[in-house]
Amino acid sequence: MTKTDYLMRLRKCTTIDTLERVIEKNKYELSDDELELFYSAADHRLAELTMNKLYDKIPPTVWQHVK
């Protein structure tokens, strides 16, 4: 799967808590290469949830608000 595929699946998560649960579950199930793509998509989704806005590409200024 690609980062975009993971991102589309993660967009079903509507809260940060749900996203964290999905991240925790997949941490043990994915290979290292898949995990790198998954974490990238998860960070992207976390930024979207934090700003309450969907992005194709996250602006650099948004990352200062993400914990």
Swiss-Prot record:
One of its GO terms (molecular function) is DNA binding. Keywords: DNA-binding, Transcription, Transcription regulation. SUPFAM superfamilies: Hemolysin expression modulating protein HHA. It comes from the Bacteria. InterPro entries: Hemolysn_expr_modulating_HHA (IPR007985), HHA_sf (IPR036666). Pfam families: HHA. Monomer. Interacts with H-NS, in the absence of DNA. This is Modulating protein YmoA.
